[in-house]
Amino acid sequence: MKRAIIIVLDSVGMGELPDAAKYGDEGSNTLGNIAKNLPDFSLPNLESLGLGNIDGMTGYEPSKNPLGSYGRMAEKSAGKDTTTGHWEIAGLILDKPFPVYPNGFPEDIIKRFEDSIGTKTLGNVPASGTEIIKLLGDEHVKTGYPIVYTSADSVFQIAAHENVIPVERLYDMCRTARNILTGEHAVGRVIARPFIGESGNYKRTDRRKDFSLAPVGKTLLDYAVENGYKVKAVGKIEDIFGGRGITESVHIHDNMDGVDRTLEYMRDDFEGILFTNLVDFDMLYGHRNDIAGYANALKEFDRRIPEILANLREDDLLVITADHGCDPSTESTDHSREYVPLLVYGKKFKSNVNLGTRSTFADVAKTVAHYLGISSNLEGESFLGSIL
């Protein structure tokens, strides 16, 4: 019973890509700079799999006998956002980035949105999510108008206090925006950003929801379902793929809930793919430049590795990777264009294999398809022959 378990540590990059300067990301190194800022920092279980052995990795102890195979992957797609990264992991490479709005959205888009939802909006600026609710939260509570904002990524975000606009109504507003944002304005994601609290102490909740574009081509998940496999999704995977190519999914409250749900699915009898996204690294710490918080979240995940390994079956293939960077040590609060780590482990797979620098995240999709015996036109190159 063959299964591939892919765990994406959202934003856990490991050093600037050669084209990082084009994205304003020179010097970004999410994992390396966290270790540099915290001299005694270590991730012993990830290091035992080969984290410190990866070409170009700094700040982590190389293992003399890594349990797994290890490498790093470059992003071939144009962009550095969640959707682009996950689609590429699933074998779909984008040759042009999603549109971004450094000056806010065009007036005609905002007017169409306001007309459709029957109310005015606030904001329409690029901003940090925590800062925008500090700035406009009181006015929102007073007027009832939702807050629209964006970032350096291709996102249309709508923030609303849960007592002012009920969460289900906020989700409906997001669906409306998603239907409007097509063609040249087809942003990667529309995101619901509910918050609670009182003036001066507003706090975002875990009821965030992403409304992604449907993938523009077939992904590993589509091929897997077509071939009769189960595809189980944990976290925001279902949202990222617009629900396509997924047979069962569960949303999560935080990283540790995500690991719990992953373990539950691992204990199920099924053949196919388990795809998990753990978003706290990015959402709670990377974007907020919280080095200590990010480091603690990494340690929390690292402590769960023995549990994950203990629940692997004989034919399971485990892949741990990331979708982009979000270096909390830099001035930027946005994603960074970085290499991502690649750790691969399974009871019947070789240990201590250096997979080198892969030219695309899509090598994961090609390898998983190869392992499951799926014929596909996916991008990427399989490394199965190196590890089996």
UniProtKB/Swiss-Prot annotation:
Protein's recorded name: Phosphopentomutase
Record InterPro entries: Alkaline_phosphatase_core_sf (IPR017850), DeoB (IPR010045), Metalloenzyme (IPR006124), Phosphopentomutase_DeoB_cap_sf (IPR024052)
Needed cofactors: Mn(2+)
Cofactor note: Binds 2 manganese ions.
An example Gene Ontology molecular-function term: magnesium ion binding
A Pfam family hit: Metalloenzyme
Catalytic activity of the protein: 2-deoxy-alpha-D-ribose 1-phosphate = 2-deoxy-D-ribose 5-phosphate; alpha-D-ribose 1-phosphate = D-ribose 5-phosphate
Keyword Cell division: no
Keywords: Cytoplasm, Isomerase, Manganese, Metal-binding
Pathway stated in the Swiss-Prot or TrEMBL entry: Carbohydrate degradation; 2-deoxy-D-ribose 1-phosphate degradation; D-glyceraldehyde 3-phosphate and acetaldehyde from 2-deoxy-alpha-D-ribose 1-phosphate: step 1/2
